[in-house]
Curated annotation (Swiss-Prot):
Taxonomic lineage of the native organism: Archaea, Thermoproteota, Thermoprotei, Thermoproteales, Thermoproteaceae
Residues the record lists as binding Zn(2+): Q218, H221, D306, H363
Role of this protein: Catalyzes the sequential NAD-dependent oxidations of L-histidinol to L-histidinaldehyde and then to L-histidine.
Catalytic reactions on record: L-histidinol + 2 NAD(+) + H2O = L-histidine + 2 NADH + 3 H(+)
Organism the protein comes from: Pyrobaculum aerophilum (strain ATCC 51768 / DSM 7523 / JCM 9630 / CIP 104966 / NBRC 100827 / IM2)
Keywords: Amino-acid biosynthesis, Histidine biosynthesis, Metal-binding, NAD, Oxidoreductase, Zinc
Enzyme class: oxidoreductase
UniProt name for this protein: Histidinol dehydrogenase
Amino acid sequence: MRGFPREVLESVWKIVDDVQSGGLKAALEYSKRLDGVAPEPHLVTPRQGGDPEVVSAALAAAKSLEALYSRISPPAAVDFYGGILRQILWKPVRRAALYVPARYISTLVMLAVPARLAGVEEVYVVTPPRGVSEELLAVAKELGVKAVLALGGPHGLAYAVFHMGVDVVAGPGGLYVQAAKYILSQYVGIDGIEGPTELVIYAEGVPPEVAVRGALAQLEHGPTSFAYLLSPDGELLKKAEELYVRERTSSMGPLKVKKVGGIDEAVSFIDEIAPEHLEVWGRREVAYRVRNVGAVSVNMPSPYLDYVAGISHVLPTGGTARWRGVITPLAFMKPIGIAEAVGELTLREAARKLAEYEGFKYHGEALR
C-alpha cells in the first residue's frame, strides 16, 4: 500500500483527533455511526465457549506457530572493551494492541503467539463488534489475551493508543485501519502498513491446476489483490490462465502470467516485485535465492502457510518486503544498550577530542 488518498487521511485524522480528546464517548459514537452499534461492554474478557472444532483448529495453528517461534530469540551481545562492560539487552514492550479483522481468528493466532513469546505483559485484541465471537473469545483466553476491545477501525485503534496506553499496534486491516496505523505511528510502534494480498507463483513440472489453485485462494481476498504466475513452460501458463478465467469470480483480483527463461530471470523478477507471498512448485532452490519476499511456501499451497505451517501470515505488502519481513516476537521487543565502567576508561581522550571538534564544551569537560 503506497500512500493514502487525501480524503482518507483527512477522515482518519479527524477520527483520531476526536477520540484522543473525547475518549470512550467519542469512540462509541463512531462505532454506532460506522458499525451500527455502540458495544456494551466495550472491553470483553476472554472466556471459554464457541464451536469446539473451530477453537481446536485455531489452537492447532497456534501450537504449530509456537513450535517454531519459540526458537526465535534476539542475539546475545555482551562484550568487554576499553574498561567498559557493554551489552545489548532486548526487552518486551509492556502493552500491545493486536488488530484482528472481524471473524479472522487465524489472525489473532498469528499475532498473539509472537506477542506472548516476546513477553508482552498486557495483550489486547482490537476488533469490530461483529468480530467478538465466542470462538474468538475462547482462543483469546487460551493465548493469554487480557481483554478484547469491541471497537474496530480507526476509532478502536485510537482508543487503544490514547486511553489504554498500548506501546505497539500490529495487524492487518483495510485502508482506513492502515491509515490509522500510519497516523498513530507518531505515538506508538507499528509492525508496518499492510495492504492488499500479493502472490507470486513459480511453477515448473506440475499440472496447471496445482499452480492456479493457490492463485484463486489468494485472489479471493478481493479485487485489489493480485497474483503473478511465472514458469518457463508456455503450455502450463496457457492452460493455467484458461483455468483461472473459468474459475474466477467478479470479486477476485487479476492473475498475470509471465514466461521466464529460467530461475535467474524468475528470481530477479520476484525480487523486483517484493511480494507478500511466494509459492514455489517444482524448483525449491527458487525459495532460497529470493531476497525480497514476506514468506515462501514450497510444494504446498499458500493457504497452508496462511493457517498452519507455523509462520505468521502477517506479512509485508506493497513492496515493503524489500526492507521488512514476517512478523516475529522481535516486533514486540526493543534493544537497549548498556555500558558499565568496570575498569580504566581507555578511550576518554578520544571522546573528549570528538566533543571538542563538534563544539560541545560541557561534553568535553565531563570527560576530563
